[in-house]
């Protein structure tokens, strides 16, 4: 999982990327290709 300042570029890396909010943190998850996971930090 990458920790990034801006998730906009992380979201655009793959068409299956979704932005989710969990416990006050913003995540990018990708069910089909989990290597695109990221968290905003």
UniProtKB/Swiss-Prot annotation:
| Pfam families (alphabetical) | Ribosomal_L36 (PF00444)
Top-level taxon? Bacteria
Looking at the UniProt record for this protein, which Gene Ontology cellular component terms does it annotate, in alphabetical order? Answer: ribonucleoprotein complex; ribosome
* SUPFAM superfamilies reported in the protein's UniProt record: Ribosomal protein L36
Biological processes, Gene Ontology terms:
translation
One of the entry's Gene Ontology molecular-function terms is: structural constituent of ribosome
> Which keywords does UniProt give here?
Ribonucleoprotein, Ribosomal protein
Query: Does the keyword field hold Ribonucleoprotein?
Result: yes
Q: Which family does it belong to?
A: Belongs to the bacterial ribosomal protein bL36 family.
Spell out the protein name for this chain.
Answer: Large ribosomal subunit protein bL36
List the source organism: Paramagnetospirillum magneticum (strain ATCC 700264 / AMB-1)
